[in-house]
Structures are given as C-alpha cells and as structure tokens.
C-alpha cells in the first residue's frame, strides 16, 4: 500500500491499521490526554512567512529529494519556513522513514508502525548532499522505539557516508531521546560524532504529559549532558516552543536547567498548531518577550541563542553553528 493510500486510510476513519501513517485526528485520538479544542486565537501581525516560488531552488530541491527517495522534516512537519529555507538551498533531512512511534500532539509528522530501515538511505543521503553542494546539513529522524539502538547506528552510517562524499560539509544531528536505549545509543554515536548534537526539550516539564507523551524531561536533559561528557568537543543544542500554556518564568527555569546540563546553544520559537486536531495555541508571545528570552540566554552563558516567533530548531542552523564557533559552518 502506498504512503498516500495509508495516510488517507488513517485520516478517513477506516478500520485501524497500525502500518498506516496516521495524521491529525487519527494520530491524536489514541493519546492518554485528549486534545481539547480551544478558541482559535487570531495570528498577530508579527507572524509572517515567505512562500517558495518557482524562481527559487524550492522545486529543484523537492525534485532531487524525491529522486533519491528522501524525506525532509521541513515537509513532514509542515514547517512554516520551508519556502525560505528551500529557496536558499538548505534542508533538514529526516531519516528512518516518515512514520514515528510517538504521538506528540504538537507535531505534524505521521504516526504508525515504521517500515524496515532502508539500507540504501545513508548512500542516497550522501549523494543528495553532494549533488546540492551543501556546506551545512541537519539530519533528524522520527522516533524509532522499535529499534534496539533507537536508530543510533543508522545516524552514524549517515554521518560516515556524508563525510566520505562531502568532507567539508558540517553535520548537525537532531536526535530523538533514545528512550530506554541511552547507553547503547551514546556508545554508538561517539564512534562518529556530529559537529553539533541537538535534542529538543520542546516544552516545560509541567506540560510533558500532555505535549510529549512517552518522553521524560530529566531523561532528555541527561542525554545531552552525557553526550557532552563523552564527546566534550562537540557543542550541544536544544530548543523550546512557546504558546502551549507555559509561563515566561517556566521557560526561564528550563533555560537554567539546560545550562546546568552544559547545553551550549538554544532555540526558542512560537508554536503554531498544524491543524484543529493538534494542541491549540494558548498564546502568541510578543517580540519583546522573545528579546527578553534572548538577553537572559546570553546572561546564562549560552554561546548562541536563536530566539523569535518563526525560529525553529533547524532554522538558519548554519549561522547558529558558525556564531557558536563551529569551523566551516558557513561556506
């Protein structure tokens, strides 16, 4: 069954099929805490994005991705910056398929029983990065709780093959939490470490049960701290969303926890609900508040903080890495 058909089956209320990619209501219907619709808040004037156009590299990149059977989180997660990033010739590659084993109700990536790993994916990824002549790439993935190493070995193979094909390219990875597999995953990752290690905290601990079912706040902090202990020369990075119902003080507390766990780089952006079946936006954070978060981040000792309404963890990642001291992050 094709991806298009399985997605359609999951969305139209057909009999439950664990192999189908579930999106929107089909995905969130089975989580422990139900998503309660709320009044839709009007988007403020400062929420603006640029659409891709045929005059940019937007369609060129999409065609190359399809040719090599690759996915991007830009597309799967409906990122609002896709037009700008594709237009500039940058993308965040999503490996290990397009079906996640988690059901996070803020995220637009589909849920379902994942397909077996594609053994050709690392080579296809390396060829694509070389063909696009990218100097900085971000590699992320769905959660793969079905794999004994959580997918760490596949990450390492992608890193190795990309470096073999494009030795000057800098590689950032945005990894899942490797729940229950941290020791094994870290042992594997340190054999071919990335140039930047990113794992998103996403939200404040009070909202974890609602927003990140299956995840643990302290576990995520520990993952980044332990990686830094194992590979001290690689900067660590994490990101937060605002607008899920947290307070400013709670965000500042998470930032302090990040620094206490030796996290170097920070991103904070506005949460935008992908659909009416996802968690609702509880507030739109004013630019002045984002500026306050940025100021406080540097006071706390972050080497770089990308903070703003349209910031996402991979947005302008090359510039973030360059400013944080990663050599060659900008070609």
From Swiss-Prot:
Disulfide bonds: none annotated. Residues 85-303 form the Radical SAM core domain. Belongs to the radical SAM superfamily. Lipoyl synthase family. [4Fe-4S] cluster 1 binds at residues 74, 79, 85, 314. The keyword 4Fe-4S applies. Its EC number is 2.8.1.8. It is found in: Cytoplasm. Binds 2 [4Fe-4S] clusters per subunit. One cluster is coordinated with 3 cysteines and an exchangeable S-adenosyl-L-methionine. The keyword Plastid does not apply. Keywords: 4Fe-4S, Cytoplasm, Iron, Iron-sulfur, Metal-binding, S-adenosyl-L-methionine, Transferase. Its main location: cytoplasm. This is Lipoyl synthase. It comes from Leptothrix cholodnii (strain ATCC 51168 / LMG 8142 / SP-6) (Leptothrix discophora (strain SP-6)). GO terms for molecular function: 4 iron, 4 sulfur cluster binding; lipoate synthase activity; metal ion binding. Its cofactor is [4Fe-4S] cluster. [4Fe-4S] cluster 2 binds at residues 100, 104, 107. One of its GO terms (cellular component) is cytoplasm. PANTHER family: LIPOYL SYNTHASE, LIPOYL SYNTHASE, MITOCHONDRIAL. It catalyses: [[Fe-S] cluster scaffold protein carrying a second [4Fe-4S](2+) cluster] + N(6)-octanoyl-L-lysyl-[protein] + 2 oxidized [2Fe-2S]-[ferredoxin] + 2 S-adenosyl-L-methionine + 4 H(+) = [[Fe-S] cluster scaffold protein] + N(6)-[(R)-dihydrolipoyl]-L-lysyl-[protein] + 4 Fe(3+) + 2 hydrogen sulfide + 2 5'-deoxyadenosine + 2 L-methionine + 2 reduced [2Fe-2S]-[ferredoxin]. It is an enzyme of class 2 (transferase). PROSITE patterns: RADICAL_SAM.
């Amino acid at each position: 069954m094709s991806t298009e058909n399985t997605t359609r089956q999951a969305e139209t209320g057909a009999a439950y099929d664990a192999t189908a990619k579930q999106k929107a209501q089909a995905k969130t219907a089975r989580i422990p805490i139900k998503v309660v619709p709320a009044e839709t808040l009007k988007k403020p004037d400062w929420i603006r994005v640029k659409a891709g156009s045929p005059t940019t590299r937007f369609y060129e990149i999409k065609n190359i991705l399809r040719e090599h059977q690759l996915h991007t989180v830009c597309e799967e997660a409906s990122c609002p910056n896709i037009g700008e990033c594709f237009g500039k010739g940058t993308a965040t590659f999503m490996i290990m398929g397009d079906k996640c084993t988690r059901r996070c109700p803020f995220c637009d990536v589909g849920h379902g029983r994942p397909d077996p790993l594609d053994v050709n994916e690392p080579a296809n990824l390396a060829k694509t990065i070389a063909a696009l002549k990218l100097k900085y790439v971000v590699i992320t993935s769905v959660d793969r709780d079905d794999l004994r190493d959580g997918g760490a070995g596949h990450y390492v193979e992608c890193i190795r093959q990309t470096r073999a094909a494009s030795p000057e390219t800098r590689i950032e990875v945005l990894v899942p939490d490797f729940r229950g597999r941290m020791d094994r995953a870290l042992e594997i990752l340190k054999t071919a470490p990335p140039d930047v290690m990113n794992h998103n905290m996403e939200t404040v601990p009070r909202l974890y049960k609602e927003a990140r079912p299956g995840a643990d706040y302290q576990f995520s902090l520990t993952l980044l701290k332990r990686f830094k202990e194992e590979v001290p020369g690689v900067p660590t990075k994490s990101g937060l969303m605002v607008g899920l119902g947290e307070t400013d003080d709670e965000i500042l507390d998470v930032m302090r926890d990040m620094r206490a766990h030796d996290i170097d780089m920070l991103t904070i952006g506005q949460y935008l609900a992908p659909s009416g079946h996802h968690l609702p936006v509880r507030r739109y954070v004013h630019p002045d508040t984002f500026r306050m978060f940025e100021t406080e981040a540097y006071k706390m000792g972050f080497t770089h903080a990308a903070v703003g309404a349209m910031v996402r963890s991979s947005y302008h990642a090359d510039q973030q890495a360059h400013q944080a001291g990663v050599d060659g992050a900008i070609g």
